């Protein structure tokens, strides 16, 4: 899970990409909500914002704009 705009968002489905990068862990590195990890990249596929229904990434990003280079907590 991560926190964004004071809301907890659970990651329900994701894919791990074994790729080198230079970003700080937790940084959003693409418009499709790919998140830099300490090692590799997490490509989020399905998530759920607190008190909301689960959404695939396309549905979620239509209503929530998490900008590239945002550092998630």
UniProtKB/Swiss-Prot annotation:
Catalysed reactions listed for this entry: L-methionyl-tRNA(fMet) + (6R)-10-formyltetrahydrofolate = N-formyl-L-methionyl-tRNA(fMet) + (6S)-5,6,7,8-tetrahydrofolate + H(+)
Record key words, sorted: Protein biosynthesis, Transferase
Class of this enzyme: transferase
Any matching Pfam family: Formyl_trans_C
Signal peptide residue numbers: none
Gene Ontology terms for molecular function: methionyl-tRNA formyltransferase activity
Record-listed E.C. numbers: 2.1.2.9
Family: Belongs to the Fmt family.
Function noted in UniProt: Attaches a formyl group to the free amino group of methionyl-tRNA(fMet). The formyl group appears to play a dual role in the initiator identity of N-formylmethionyl-tRNA by promoting its recognition by IF2 and preventing the misappropriation of this tRNA by the elongation apparatus.
Identification of the protein by name: Methionyl-tRNA formyltransferase
Organism whose genome encodes this protein: Rickettsia amblyommatis
């Amino acid at each position: 899970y991560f926190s964004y705009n004071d809301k907890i968002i659970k990651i329900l489905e994701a894919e791990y990409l074994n790729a080198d990068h230079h970003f700080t862990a937790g940084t959003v590195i693409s418009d499709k909500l790919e998140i830099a990890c300490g090692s590799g990249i997490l490509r989020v596929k399905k998530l759920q914002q607190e008190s909301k229904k689960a959404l695939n990434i396309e549905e979620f990003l239509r209503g929530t704009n998490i900008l590239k280079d945002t550092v998630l907590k």
